[in-house]
Amino acid sequence: MKTNLTPQDLISFEEEIGECFNNAEIRAPIHLYSGNEEKIIKIFEDVKEEDYVFCTWRSHYQCLLKGVPRDRLKKDILAGKSITLCYPEYRIFSSAIVTGSVPIANGRALAEKRKGSAANVWCFVGEMTSETGSFHENV
């Protein structure tokens, strides 16, 4: 997807969310990104609007890069939804469960393939995911 977001835009968003958390404006877990801004922007150059994105509880960057408006994302995070951000209209879904999004992404990919769709399915996970049986069953 073509984005006008810069690494600094992503960093600033996470810093703002961290500040809200430190000021007790968020009464739920948050998981912030740091250090991979250029890489994820590069990856999202290949993500199309019709593509699906699945990720874990650390999904703020993916949501922003998939087109979720900054203010809407911040509002949902402030409401305590940081680890379960789902925006079907933007085709982005996250799960608070390690490996929780992997089988769902796998099923979505199979459905898109069977429909003959041009949509791709992208699944972002952390390193602990590779230690779970569900990951290996789905990959």
Residues covered by each model-derived region:
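Cofactor-/ligand-binding subdomain signature composed of acidic, glycine-rich
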Residues: 1-29
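Cofactor-binding active-site loop characterized by glycine-rich and histidine/acidic residues
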Residues: 18, 24-139
